């Protein structure tokens, strides 16, 4: 069982095979949690800005008790992380707002397809700024995933979806940047950045939102979207970045773009077409093969 305080701490972990396997498990679990966002948003039935505001507000409210519980350690992390924590918060806030807006402009499958670019941008940025090595099998897995992504795009593009996909690409840039920042400062806990991002994104959304229109029947879905889906997924992803390279964590995150349309298909009847399913299967196979090959590498 994963303890919340161990994720909030998120100090640098060892580079053993066991630690890397745990990091991969965290990344996969985070992707599975993130993949539920589309189906949850579909059940809220509020304008995008309202969803963005309440998602941020509930994140701030629910995370605060945990941060206060760990306040001594949190203040140490805040002082140690310095500008990196603020940069992480700004990048996360940008992704929070852009993601909800993208879902309001395009079908879930189209939005998630854009997230397929995340591991490539992350891996390149990590190589340039952190000097992280890219193994040949990881590069091959990324190339195969590009093929799957291209097939999915061919099957999923719809009229009017380009605007949503363009906004989704902002999410990709923000998340890739955050992965690199968190990986760079893996010596400190970056959980406060999630809370601060909620504050920033809530303030950005407030002028465009009408919070008073929310109904009690929508509150459970908002709670599932915010502390459940958003905070839980981010804590797991940040924990994974303490144990595995940023590019590998982002590659495993591709599972989100495959699972997301599946949940919407199963629960809302928004069925992706055959090319989207074929492309998604290729992406899953590439990610799975990369994990398997990583597991066969000598520890160290």
Predicted features and spans:
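Hydrophobic/aromatic residues within transmembrane alpha-helices
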Residues: 44, 51, 55, 102, ...
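Alpha-helical transmembrane segments of compact multi-pass small-molecule transporters, enriched
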Residues: 58-62, 114-128, 143-144, 199-204, ...
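Hydrophobic alpha-helical transmembrane segments of multi-pass membrane transport proteins
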Residues: 32-36, 40-43, 66, 86-101, ...
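Loop-to-transmembrane alpha-helix entry segments
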Residues: 79, 112-115, 128-151, 155-165, ...
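Glycine-/small-residue-enriched transmembrane alpha-helix faces in small-molecule transporters
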Residues: 2-53, 57, 90, 98, ...
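C-terminal-most transmembrane helix of multi-pass membrane proteins
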Residues: 2-4, 8-13, 56, 154, ...
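Hydrophobic transmembrane alpha-helices of multi-pass small-molecule transport proteins
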Residues: 2, 63, 92, 134-154, ...
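Membrane-interface interhelical linkers
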Residues: 1-29, 60-87, 99-100, 130-139, ...
């Amino acid at each position: 069982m994963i303890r919340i305080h161990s994720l909030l701490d998120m100090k640098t972990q060892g580079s053993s095979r066991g630690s890397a396997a745990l990091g991969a498990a965290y990344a996969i679990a985070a992707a599975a949690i993130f993949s539920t966002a589309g189906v949850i948003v579909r059940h809220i039935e509020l304008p995008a800005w309202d969803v963005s505001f309440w998602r941020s507000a509930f994140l701030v409210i629910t995370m605060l008790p945990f941060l206060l519980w760990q306040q001594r350690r949190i203040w140490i992390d805040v002082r140690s992380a310095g500008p990196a924590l603020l940069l992480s918060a700004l990048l996360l806030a940008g992704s929070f707002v852009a993601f909800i807006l993208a879902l309001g402009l395009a079908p879930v499958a189209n939005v998630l397809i854009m997230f397929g670019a995340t591991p490539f941008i992350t891996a390149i940025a990590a190589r340039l700024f952190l000097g992280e090595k890219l193994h040949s099998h990881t590069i091959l897995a990324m190339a195969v995933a590009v093929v799957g992504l291209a097939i999915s795009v061919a099957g999923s593009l719809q009229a009017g979806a380009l605007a949503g996909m363009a906004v989704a690409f902002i999410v990709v840039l923000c998340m890739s940047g955050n992965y690199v920042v968190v990986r760079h400062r893996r010596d400190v806990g970056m959980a406060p950045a999630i809370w601060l991002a909620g504050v920033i994104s809530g303030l950005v959304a407030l002028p465009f939102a009408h919070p008073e229109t929310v109904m009690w029947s929508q509150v459970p879905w908002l709670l599932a979207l915010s502390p459940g889906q958003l905070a839980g997924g981010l804590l797991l992803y940040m924990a994974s970045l303490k144990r595995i390279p940023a590019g590998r964590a982002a590659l495993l995150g591709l599972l989100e773009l495959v699972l997301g349309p599946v949940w919407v298909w199963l629960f809302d009847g928004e069925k992706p077409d055959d090319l989207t399913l074929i492309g998604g299967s290729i992406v899953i196979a590439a990610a799975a093969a990369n994990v398997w090959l990583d597991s066969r590498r000598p520890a160290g």
